[in-house]
């Protein structure tokens, strides 16, 4: 009875107390609400949008910091006709930043057959286009024959000469070969040809030029449907070669390069059957004439060796000239004669003993076939390397005492120039090393040469092949979104092919690219012959497979600076110190990757001047492609004029850096746009802005003016050292390079802005994300201080809620001063007296506070700085209530989005986004620790600082279906009895903030790229702003301890966090020779001069 009476009294007391609180609140609002001032401020910054929709948002003046809308009740309500439509919201957003151009996402239209050319002629010319045939050769339309083929009819059968091109005009044609299954043999379709596609054996061209009959032993063509085909016989090639042999050198080189890239590299690197490409049953050279060679005198050895070399090179009448160039060498067993990946392309002719060729450390491929190959007396090497002008695929080691003759590179180039038949003989000799299986594979594989903007395939196309990028860069797009970009040796489309579904995305060429296309039917044939290939393909699929993009990340804009091989550097004005900038950047890049700097003056040292000025030169093009193989990153420095070199730089670039002076306006720097227009193919690469500022610049400014006019995928602000601006504008490039070589190169400051840019470009960027947690975020200050003391580099920063504020403070002042600014924010919050708090109270329609004092506090810390004007790249997370999604903010005025990221529901109202009018709330509700977003924006490693509270579910009271707050308050004050453990409103809010991102947090904790730091500060409340020092000390101690653990984990981890990680990319060795000669526009790779030599 007593218990019942006490409950009734408490209920009455609770109702009376609530009534009194409401009356007090109404009185305080009536007397202290600054209605006139707030109404004026609201009208000043949020004018009536019904009069002028273009004035939805006006930047606040510097000396009158007000706030965003206090409450929707304070504004004129729009009628249904005045509601902002999605189109109007989008228009408003576009005024803040330029939207990506359609060229980034839409490929060119498919090439159509011209009306003035017959389809059969057009398709034959397209099939021959990639061979780069000499201009002296012309196609005679009379030699093209058109045939109508019934279903099942055979067009080409084994035993016939393989000297014909077959092009499908309509219908389908199958390429078949025999395969054994048990005791039976079956016809296996290794490729299906459709309209516009062709069949011909490119290796047969070498035999045709040698006037040999290329026999077809393994292939037959059969019509899968009724079709029309065009045939053209290649016999005219030999006639043209006899008349102009020098002009066919480039075609021979293209054929052999295609063989190496399409067949040899593919089978070895991706299918694991490199040993099957070697012809173990090849006809060995006649070694009898070299019997007892070591017993001959020196003069006899030289005479006999020179005669044999001249005979092998096809110039027996030039023995006397060769004798002056040839040098004899002897080596013992175990001596390495040539190195793998070397550009030492001196020609070697073995006359005694035996050499063994070997690739890598493996003795056998996945099928158990030996990867070694023996070279006997009478063999020349490295013939394939000489032909393709690419690094050696194998090393050569002596198995016994060996005698060989060598002709240095410069000498035999002279012979090649004078006697082009040598080049053809080398190619014919190299084909003797290729197995019949490799030849069949080479006939079915296709080598695409795709111009900028062309589509490799389109969304919805049939997935019947996989592709390998051998050169260039491609981009996968989906409507208006970049999915992925692909560089050299990347795989494309293998997952779609494995899942047998239509292409999910469109893949287009960002620049001129070389692609190897492997049909699904060919892979099935290979798996039948060598089942071990299936395991290799599964590994490739597992590496390429990616989980579907979460909805919360579907709109993340990324710069995709992954696997960059070439970068074009374009000046925004003639006053930009371009050479100095390129040298500074080169110096920092060289500590991460093997880098080459090329400018027009550098290339002129190796080529005739007319080569640089020509619009198209295949020799220079090939030479530049070889540099991409030899170096991990090539910097192309453009000219200050619209020259062919500038055009070539833009065409060869994976990405473009536009360098501008931060102290000058955009109107004064319009040169870059003019230079970009000289690329008639259009600019489809990612284009990023780089602003150069004096070293003592406090804060950048003016970036918004650039991004309003043109789209840039990123922007970087660099505080340049004084030496960058010390040279007069007309100083010769050679003088500047000499200064950097003698004074600067090797001097690395990992804390500099140039070093930060180098890490971003090489994929070594370090990002840090600060999590939300209210006043517990004070621990972020201690964590940041520990990171700075440990010299951990921070290249990108992001955060949620209180972490967004701390991240923004570091982004604008990237040094220890940011810690002091964090403390100032907490001190500012403590200055609010009771009267200020009461004045900020309002009727709890959107929140119990107007947000006015909160706005002033945040804006006082950040002023009117734009996000794009930060020294360090910054983003923050908010919850978009209008679209029920996560928002990632990377541009616009900083303080409103930071404030919205800290807006706890129920306490302060959401902020109306000035760009589109969406309601934004605390980002902790969707992603409290956005390490995954930081990773998607290009960070290689992410340091995640978590100050969220851990769930403590122990001793929670099971109070049933209802509970009285007054009873809980009474129990808290009552000193007798057991403690009542019930979640209060703050605790409920905290837990709600983590409900939606629990799974994401677990993924982040276990991610290999993430270095997770959990700060144990659960004892602090989210409004304990008076305990800054205590929380900061805990953050400092724990973070320092965790960093020491990470450093001790491995040397690689330490180097990553300190910003000095070096990319592990296997790159060929440089040549040791200094001189270079060119022959028929095909120079070999020279040693880079001192001004471009990498450390």
UniProtKB/Swiss-Prot annotation:
Chain positions of motif DGA/G: 922-924
Region named Disordered: 75-113
CDD domains listed in its UniProt record: CAP_ED
Record-listed a nucleoside 3',5'-cyclic phosphate 3 binding positions: 450-509
Classification via Pfam families: cNMP_binding, NTE_Ploop, Patatin
PANTHER family xref list: NEUROPATHY TARGET ESTERASE/SWISS CHEESE D.MELANOGASTER, PATATIN-LIKE PHOSPHOLIPASE DOMAIN-CONTAINING PROTEIN M110.7-RELATED
The protein, known as: Putative patatin-like phospholipase domain-containing protein M110.7
Species of the source: Caenorhabditis elegans
């Amino acid at each position: 009875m007593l218990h019942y009476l006490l409950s009734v009294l408490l209920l009455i007391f609770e109702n009376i107390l609530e009534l009194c609180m409401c009356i007090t609140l109404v009185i305080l609002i009536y007397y202290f609400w600054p209605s006139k001032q707030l109404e004026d401020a609201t009208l000043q910054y949020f004018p009536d949008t019904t009069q002028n929709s273009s004035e939805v948002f006006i930047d606040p003046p510097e000396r009158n910091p007000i706030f965003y809308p206090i409450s929707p009740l304070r504004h004129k309500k729009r009628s249904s006709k005045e509601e902002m439509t999605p189109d109007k919201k989008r228009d408003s957003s576009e005024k803040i930043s330029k939207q990506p151009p359609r060229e980034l996402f839409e490929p060119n239209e498919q090439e159509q057959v011209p009306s003035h050319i017959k389809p059969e002629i057009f398709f034959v010319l397209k099939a021959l286009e990639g061979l780069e045939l000499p201009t002296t050769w012309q196609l005679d339309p009379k030699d093209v024959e058109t045939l109508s083929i019934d279903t099942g009819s055979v067009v080409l059968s084994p035993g016939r000469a393989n000297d014909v091109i077959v092009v499908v005009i309509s219908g389908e044609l199958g390429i078949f070969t025999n395969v054994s299954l048990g005791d039976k043999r079956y016809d296996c379709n290794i490729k299906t040809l459709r309209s516009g596609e062709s069949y011909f054996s490119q290796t047969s061209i070498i035999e045709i030029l040698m006037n040999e009959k290329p026999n077809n032993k393994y292939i037959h063509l059969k019509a899968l449907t009724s079709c029309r085909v065009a045939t053209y016989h290649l016999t005219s090639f030999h006639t043209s070669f006899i008349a102009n042999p020098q002009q066919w050198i480039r075609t021979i080189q293209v054929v052999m390069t295609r063989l190496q890239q399409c067949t040899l590299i593919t089978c070895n690197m991706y299918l694991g059957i490199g040993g099957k490409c070697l012809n173990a049953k090849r006809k060995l050279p006649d070694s009898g004439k070299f019997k007892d060679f070591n017993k001959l005198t020196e003069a006899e050895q030289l005479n006999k060796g020179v005669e044999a070399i001249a005979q092998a090179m096809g110039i027996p009448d030039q023995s006397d000239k060769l004798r002056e160039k040839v040098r004899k060498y002897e080596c013992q067993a175990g001596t390495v004669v040539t190195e793998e990946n070397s550009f030492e392309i001196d020609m070697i002719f073995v006359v005694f003993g035996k050499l063994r060729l070997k690739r890598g450390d493996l003795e056998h491929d996945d099928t158990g076939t030996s990867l070694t190959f023996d070279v006997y007396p009478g063999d020349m090497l490295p013939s394939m390397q000489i032909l393709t002008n690419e690094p050696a695929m194998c090393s050569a080691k002596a198995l016994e005492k060996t005698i060989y003759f060598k002709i240095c590179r410069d000498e035999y180039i002279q012979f090649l120039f004078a006697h082009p038949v040598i080049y053809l003989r080398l190619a014919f000799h190299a084909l003797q090393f290729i197995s019949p299986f490799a030849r069949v594979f080479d006939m079915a594989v296709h080598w695409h040469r795709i111009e900028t903007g062309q589509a490799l395939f389109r969304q919805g196309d049939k997935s019947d092949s996989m592709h390998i990028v051998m050169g260039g860069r491609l981009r996968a797009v989906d409507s208006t979104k970049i999915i992925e970009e692909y560089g050299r040796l990347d795989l494309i489309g293998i997952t779609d092919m494995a899942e047998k579904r239509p292409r999910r995305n469109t893949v287009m060429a960002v620049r001129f690219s070389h692609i190897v296309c492997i049909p699904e039917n060919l892979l099935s044939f290979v798996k039948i012959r060598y089942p071990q290939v299936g395991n290799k393909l599964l590994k490739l699929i597992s590496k390429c497979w990616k989980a579907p993009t979460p909805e919360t990340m579907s709109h993340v804009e990324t710069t995709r600076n992954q696997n960059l091989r070439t970068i074009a550097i374009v000046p925004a004005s003639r006053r930009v110190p371009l050479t100095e900038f390129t040298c500074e950047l080169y110096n920092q890049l060289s500590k991460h990757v093997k880098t080459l700097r090329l400018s027009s003056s550098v290339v002129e040292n190796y080529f005739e001047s007319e080569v640089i000025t020509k619009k198209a030169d295949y020799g220079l093009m090939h030479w530049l492609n070889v540099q991409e193989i030899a170096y991990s990153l090539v910097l192309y420095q453009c000219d200050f004029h619209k020259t062919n070199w500038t055009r070539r730089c833009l065409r060869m670039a994976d990405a473009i850096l536009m360098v501008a002076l931060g102290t000058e306006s955009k109107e004064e720097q319009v040169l870059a746009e003019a230079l970009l227009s000289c690329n008639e193919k259009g600019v489809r690469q990612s284009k990023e802005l780089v602003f150069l500022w004096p070293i003592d610049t406090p804060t950048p400014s003016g970036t918004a003016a650039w991004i309003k006019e043109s789209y840039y995928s990123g922007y970087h602000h660099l505080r340049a050292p004084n030496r960058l601006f010390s040279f007069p504008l007309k100083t010769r490039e050679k003088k500047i390079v000499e200064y950097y070589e003698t004074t600067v190169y090797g001097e690395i400051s990992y804390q500099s802005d140039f070093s930060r840019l180098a890490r971003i470009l090489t994929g070594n960027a370090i990002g840090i994300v600060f999590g939300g947690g209210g006043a517990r975020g004070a621990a972020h200050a201690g964590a940041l201080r520990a990171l700075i003391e440990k010299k951990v580099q921070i290249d990108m920063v992001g955060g949620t809620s209180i972490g967004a504020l701390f991240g923004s403070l570091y982004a604008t002042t990237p040094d220890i001063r940011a810690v002091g600014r964090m403390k100032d924010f907490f001190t500012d919050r403590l200055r609010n007296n009771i009267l200020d708090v009461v004045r900020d109270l309002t009727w709890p329609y959107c929140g119990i506070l107007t947000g006015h004092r909160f706005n002033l506090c945040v804006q006082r810390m950040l002023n009117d700085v734009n996000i794009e004007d930060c020294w360090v790249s910054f983003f923050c997370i908010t919850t978009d209530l209008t679209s029920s999604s996560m928002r990632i903010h990377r541009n616009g005025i900083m303080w409103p989005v930071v404030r919205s990221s800290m807006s706890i529901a129920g306490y302060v109202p959401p902020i109306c986004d000035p760009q589109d009018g969406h309601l934004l709330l605390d980002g902790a509700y969707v992603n409290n620790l956005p390490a995954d977003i930081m990773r998607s924006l290009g960070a290689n490693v992410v340091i995640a600082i978590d100050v969220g509270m851990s769930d403590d579910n122990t001793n929670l009271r099971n109070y049933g279906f209802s509970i009285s707050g007054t009873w809980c308050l009474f129990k808290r004050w009552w000193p007798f009895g057991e403690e009542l453990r019930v979640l209060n409103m703050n605790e409920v809010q905290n837990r709600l903030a983590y409900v939606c991102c629990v799974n994401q947090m677990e993924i982040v904790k276990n991610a290999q790229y993430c270095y997770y730091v959990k700060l144990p500060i659960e004892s602090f409340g989210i409004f304990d702003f008076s305990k800054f020092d205590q929380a900061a000390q805990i953050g400092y101690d724990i973070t320092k301890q965790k960093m020491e653990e990470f450093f001790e984990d491995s040397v690689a981890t330490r180097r990553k966090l300190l910003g000095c990680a070096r990319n592990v990319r296997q790159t060929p060795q440089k040549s040791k020779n200094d001189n270079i000669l060119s022959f028929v526009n095909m120079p070999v790779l020279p040693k880079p001069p001192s001004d471009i030599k990498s450390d």
